[in-house]
């Protein structure tokens, strides 16, 4: 999916009644972490606006003074939650300082598969 098709994805989600997005990543222990983002912030979310302090994530090798980690949702992974139809879930890659964050589980799997 290209950036040009993101407005169509947003429109489709809104037409299906989605009010919130849930960009999600998996921590080192296999636990899913996410944030609720209003659909009105979709464009910013897809550009990586959702931040978290890497030092607060268990198992992530960062200090408190390090750059925050941003969540970059994968538009190909989107699903509308069957039990909560106004929420769209996205698998996300973590980025730090403008590049993929090595400890991110999706980035590790991508490297293994490459």
Go through each PLM region and give its residues.
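ATP/Mg2+-dependent ligation/transfer catalytic cores
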Residues: 1-114
């Amino acid at each position: 999916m290209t950036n040009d098709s993101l407005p169509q994805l947003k429109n489709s989600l809104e037409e299906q009644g989605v009010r919130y997005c849930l960009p999600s990543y998996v921590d080192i222990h296999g636990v899913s972490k996410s944030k609720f983002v209003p659909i009105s912030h979709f464009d910013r979310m897809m550009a990586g606006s959702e931040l978290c302090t890497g030092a607060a994530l268990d198992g992530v090798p960062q200090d408190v003074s390090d750059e925050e980690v941003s969540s970059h949702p994968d538009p190909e992974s989107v699903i509308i939650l069957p039990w909560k139809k106004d929420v769209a879930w996205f698998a996300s890659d973590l980025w730090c300082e403008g590049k993929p964050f090595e400890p991110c589980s999706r980035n590790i799997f991508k490297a293994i598969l490459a």
